[in-house]
Amino acid sequence: MNTKTDEGLYEKAHKLFISKASIDEFAGWATPRQVDAVHRLLDTELANRERAKHDRLLRRARFPVVKGLDGYDFTNVRLPDGYMLDELLGLGFIPRAQDLVFYGKTGRGKTHLAIGLGMKAIDMGLGVRFHQTAELVLQLGKAKRDGTLETMLRDIGRADLIILDEFGYVPFDIDGARLLYQIIAGSYERRSIIFTTNIEFSKWGTVFADDKLAAAIIDRIVHHGRLLEFTGQSRRVSEALMFGRNTSAQPEK
């Protein structure tokens, strides 16, 4: 094999945990046609593994619906000063463990954007967990009663990005608030969280039934976070079948 072929084969073999010694032995007797066949075999195996990994990450994310960002209208999404759209779509906030708060009334596309960013993260090989917040609190409470809370927290902690959808839509009792706080505090400076909410920061104390707990959460989010405001008309209303509008539109949150 020539040097270029050697390097390519070694690289592919390394990704599949095939030893250099095995490739060296193969190189000693293989014909060019055999080398080409092995290249194609390894390419196929690598592609299959990438697809399997992508599918596994997608299942673990538990998105309610799969949505990309092709055609997403950012006209009514107000970014923080100095924060560019390319930075958001480049997912630079994830390796920096920065949080994003998507704030706006219902139907402005907050959940769609959160899922779209989560899909991009999966395409990059990153782990994502999507949770409707009130449902998550119920699941955490059940896990605590069943003695499986640590297992659940470890699973969530494996993610690079956590999406807490409809944050604050339903108030929590103090026990639920403390369980949710474990996830938020445990993610601080370790992984990113996207919150979608229609509740302004000043009212988060009513959601958590504890002003001090709410203040501690806000402090962590603000320290390494950015606020994106969603304005304009409800996308659901503008695309509603009831009014004879766009019949191909997907529901938005």
Enumerate the predicted regions with their spans.
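N-terminal pre-Walker A segment at the start of P-loop NTPase domains
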Residues: 67-89
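Conserved hydrophobic/aromatic pocket- or pore-lining residues that grip, position, or stack substrates
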Residues: 72, 114, 132
